[in-house]
């Protein structure tokens, strides 16, 4: 039986959560923080316990960024650096898998680059089977191709797996007109269209990912995951973060929300 969230019933039944590599470390640091990983796992496990089918795309920038590695050096080729960055996402994925399963949340780690000893290969039908069995699916190695960001991988997997929303977890509580950590006068947007994001070059996701979400009509919610319970709040329809989509943000108790929550994902 599904657990009842203190924030109310979920609006969405299948969600793609995008976690950057910096989610796995303390602010301003690199590597792995057990405390940060545990905090992510607690929130994700509570969401899964409410009956939400959850796929998580993980980044690897806390360990290595391929694009950064190639600056000012010619020893490591750019494509190689990107592959190195992909392997970093597997480290994060393994850590998150263990943290989730330690909380009793059945989890599967899938990769687009085969690593049979430690993860399952990404096969769409297999991923869907896991989701339908209420297992959390952790997706590592991005798309498996260099020069493609994990944001784009998240947009691709969100569409491929029939997710209703792509939730991008960040350190700030939405999308701003400027960097709020540098500009105290920056204004937070509550709702945006894809066209506004592209026209104004707002820092939501890379342009390829935004274009993919536009083409597939996959809404994006950018929110601050550092605040405990925010993942549950977002899924329950509380007005947090910034909503990017063709239609207005669904809200708890609205007709659109009721229809979304009652529909079973395929």
Where would I find each of the regions flagged by the language model?
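C-terminal catalytic "cap/lid" subdomain
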Residues: 1-266
């Amino acid at each position: 039986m599904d657990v009842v969230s203190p924030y109310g019933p979920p609006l969405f039944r299948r969600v793609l959560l995008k976690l950057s590599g910096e989610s796995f470390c303390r602010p301003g640091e690199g590597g792995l923080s057990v405390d940060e990983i545990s905090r992510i796992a607690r929130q994700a496990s509570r969401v899964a316990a409410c009956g939400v089918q959850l796929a998580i795309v993980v980044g690897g920038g806390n360990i290595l960024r391929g694009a950064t590695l190639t600056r000012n050096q010619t020893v490591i080729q750019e494509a190689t650096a990107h592959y190195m960055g992909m392997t970093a996402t597997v480290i994060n994925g393994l850590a998150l898998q263990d943290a989730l399963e330690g909380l009793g949340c059945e989890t599967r780690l899938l990769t687009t680059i085969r690593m049979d000893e430690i993860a399952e290969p990404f096969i769409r039908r297999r991923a869907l089977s896991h989701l339908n069995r209420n297992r959390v699916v952790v997706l590592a190695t991005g798309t498996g191709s260099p020069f493609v960001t994990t944001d784009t991988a998240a947009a691709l997997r969100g569409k491929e797996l029939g997710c209703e929303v792509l939730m991008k977890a960040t350190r700030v509580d939405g999308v701003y007109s400027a960097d709020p950590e540098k500009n105290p006068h920056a204004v937070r947007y509550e709702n945006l269209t894809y066209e506004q994001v592209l026209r104004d070059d707002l820092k939501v996701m890379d342009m390829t990912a935004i274009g993919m979400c536009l083409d597939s009509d996959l809404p994006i919610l950018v929110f601050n995951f550092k605040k405990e319970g925010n993942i549950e709040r977002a899924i329950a329809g509380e007005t947090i973060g910034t909503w990017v989509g063709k239609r207005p943000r669904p809200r708890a108790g609205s007709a659109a929300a009721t229809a979304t929550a009652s529909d079973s994902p395929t």
